[in-house]
Regions:
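Internal intein/HINT superfamily modules and their associated LAGLIDADG
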Residues: 2-308
Length: 308
C-alpha cells in the first residue's frame, strides 16, 4: 500500500493528535541521527527529540513519539489509527481497541445517513453510527471504546419490551471514518478491513464480532463455537481472518429459516481451547460457558489483559 493515503489522512481536519508538523520540507540540519531505514523511507531523531519520517531524503511528517521495533516503526495518528513504516512501505494499521469497536458494529450495528426535507425546500442530513444489544455489558463496552477512540459518548435508548439497548453516535466525521473503511453497507452487510489489521487487530475484530453474532453452546463436556450472519461475503472474509491467525474453520453452511437464509461456520473441536485463549468473547454468557468448558476439560482458566 502506498504512502499517499496515509499522509492525506494525517492532514484531515477530522483527525486529532496529528503530527507536530506535516507537509514536505528539506531535511533539517538539526537532525541528530538516523534511527532506522526501510528502503526509500527513513526515520531520524531531531535535536528536539522529535521523530522525522522521510521519503527519499525529504521530510513528510514529524511526530513527537514513535514505537521502534526491529522490523517496523509505529507512529500514533488519532482515532485508533497507527502509521506503520516497514520494508513494505507505509500503511495505516487499526489499533486493537478500534478493531474491537469495528467488530461490534459489523455484527450488530449500522452506519448510515438520512436526509429530511424541511420547510422552504431545504434539507437536513443526520449521520449516525449505531450498535444494538440486549447485553448491558456490550453496550457499555461500545460506549467505552467510542469515548476512548473518538472522544464521544453515545446516546442510549432502552426498549423495555425486549430489553434492547440502542447506542447511537450522531457524528458526521465518525460516519465518514467508518465509511472509508467500508465496515457497513446495506442491511446486514459488513466487511472486514483486513488490509488495515495486524494480528492483534485481527484477533480484536473477531472477538468484537463474535461477541455480537457468535454462538457457543455446551452439551456435557463438549462445546460448539459458531459464527452466524445473513451476509455470506462478509462471513467468508471473517473466516479468512481466522485462517490468517492459524485456525482451520469449517466451510460455510447455509440454513433456510422463516426469516430468510442464514450462513454459518464453526471452529473445529481441536481448536476450541486455542480460540478461547487467543480470541474469547465479551458476551457474559459466552464467557461463562468458556470457563465451564475449560474447568471440565482440566485447563486452567486464564485472565486476559483486556479483562475478559
Amino acid at each position: 500500500m502506498g504512502g499517499g493515503s496515509a499522509i492525506r489522512r494525517v492532514k484531515r481536519n477530522f483527525l486529532q493528535g496529528k503530527p507536530v508538523s506535516t507537509g514536505k520540507k528539506e531535511v533539517c540540519a538539526k537532525t541528530q541521527g538516523t534511527v532506522i531505514v526501510f528502503g526509500e523511507y527513513g526515520v531520524h531523531k531531531s535535536g528536539k527529540g522529535e521523530y522525522e519520517l522521510l521519503r527519499k531524503g525529504v521530510t513528510i511528517g514529524i511526530f513527537s513519539e514513535a514505537q521502534i521495533k526491529e522490523d517496523e516503526v509505529l507512529f500514533a495518528l488519532s482515532h485508533g489509527v497507527i502509521l506503520e513504516v516497514s520494508k513494505g512501505g507505509i500503511k495505516e494499521i487499526i489499533t486493537p481497541e478500534k478493531a474491537t469497536l469495528l467488530g461490534l458494529i459489523a455484527a450488530d450495528g449500522s452506519n448510515m445517513f438520512r436526509r429530511e426535507q424541511r420547510l422552504r425546500g431545504s434539507y437536513r442530513t443526520e449521520y449516525s453510527t449505531r450498535f444494538y444489544s440486549d447485553d448491558k455489558e456490550l453496550a457499555n463496552l461500545f460506549s467505552m471504546l467510542s469515548e476512548e477512540i473518538y472522544g464521544i459518548t453515545p446516546h442510549h435508548y432502552n426498549r423495555k419490551k425486549d430489553n434492547l439497548i440502542t447506542s447511537v453516535i450522531y457524528n458526521k466525521g465518525i460516519f465518514y471514518d467508518l465509511t472509508d473503511l467500508n465496515i457497513k453497507g446495506g442491511p446486514y452487510e459488513f466487511h472486514v478491513p483486513r488490509d488495515h489489521l495486524n494480528n492483534d487487530g485481527k484477533k480484536a475484530f473477531v472477538k468484537g464480532f463474535f461477541s455480537g453474532d457468535g454462538n457457543v453452546s455446551i452439551a456435557g463436556d463438549k462445546i460448539t463455537i459458531r459464527f452466524y450472519s445473513s451476509y455470506k461475503e462478509g462471513l467468508e472474509e471473517l473466516r479468512l481472518v481466522l485462517i490468517d491467525l492459524g485456525f482451520h474453520p469449517h466451510e460455510i453452511l447455509e440454513y433456510v429459516q422463516p426469516t430468510g437464509i442464514v450462513y454459518c461456520f464453526s471452529v473445529p473441536r481441536e481448536e476450541h481451547v486455542k480460540f478461547i485463549n487467543e480470541i474469547g468473547s465479551y458476551k457474559p454468557r459466552h464467557v461463562r460457558i468458556f470457563e465451564e468448558y475449560l474447568r471440565k476439560s482440566g485447563y486452567e482458566v486464564e485472565k486476559r489483559d483486556d479483562g475478559s
